[in-house]
Amino acid sequence: MAAMEANIFCTFDHKLSIADVGKLTKLVAAVVPIPQRLHLIKHYQLGLHQFVDHTRGYVRLRGLLRNMTLTLMRRVEGNQILLHVPTHGLLYTVLNTGPVTWEKGDALCVLPPLFHGPLARENLLTLGQWELVLPWIVPMPLALEINQRLLIMGLFSLDRSYEEVKAAVQQLQTITFRDATFTIPDPVIDQHLLIDMKTACLSMSMVANLASELTMTYVRKLALEDSSMLLVKCQELLMRLDRERSVGEPRTPARPQHVSPDDEIARLSALFVMLRQLDDLIREQVVFTVCDVSPDNKSATCIFKG
């Protein structure tokens, strides 16, 4: 793709004040998502403002962000901004717009900002009814933890009153990562979170069905080769579960004689597909890898991986 096509110009309908230009200049090198890749866009297409709805769930906003085009703010020119669509494998200076510090080697992901707690997003720029809302750029472990807790809270809230859920998940809503503490919003059970919960339940049911019989066979064999305490304890646990299921029922052999090698391999393959599906629910795409962090930790030199 030609270099010129990687540049996007954003114009403002009203003349920017000196203060507004100053605010935007401080955001040079920030990651700015846009809905689609066009050569010329308007300011209201910048960031997440057009999709923010405080009556709807965080999972919805996260899904929309995943489908947006990521750009880097290059410079402010009069009444317009120059954005650049990064190229895979190239080095870029990236501004840290998230709540936590970065470290060399971090795999960074984009997440919508949390709108609750002591580290809720700051006001970057407001023009009339429009406000610039930028994503958080956070290390992968933090993104996984946020997404996992959102899913756990959603599943836990099924068939429970708001009061029960609020009391039980309070400890899940506060996350501390690298000395930064912030709050996950209450789960909103909308169609977006429902899809994730349905996928999780289907995958977990398949894992529970496929894993038990296969795991018992393999753990028993491994325990003969390696008498480590973990394997022994694992075998004891599986045998106890097997006995509990088998009370009053005919004894089932560890590996049913009618299961062919092809069938066993098919079951194993299906099991790992389900495990990957569970992982996909909480994993974010890595967009940058940190090569070097600035002394003030406000930016870093990164390789674009998106």
UniProtKB/Swiss-Prot annotation:
InterPro entries: Herpes_capsid_2 (IPR002690). Pfam families: Herpes_V23. Keywords: Capsid protein, Host nucleus, Virion. One of its GO terms (cellular component) is host cell nucleus. One of its GO terms (molecular function) is structural molecule activity. It is found in: Virion; Host nucleus. Structural component of the T=16 icosahedral capsid. The capsid is composed of pentamers and hexamers of major capsid protein/MCP, which are linked together by heterotrimers called triplexes. These triplexes are formed by a single molecule of triplex protein 1/TRX1 and two copies of triplex protein 2/TRX2. Additionally, TRX1 is required for efficient transport of TRX2 to the nucleus, which is the site of capsid assembly. Interacts with TRX1 and major capisd protein/MCP. Belongs to the herpesviridae TRX2 protein family. This is Triplex capsid protein 2. It comes from Human cytomegalovirus (strain AD169) (HHV-5). The lineage of its organism: Viruses, Duplodnaviria, Heunggongvirae, Peploviricota, Herviviricetes.
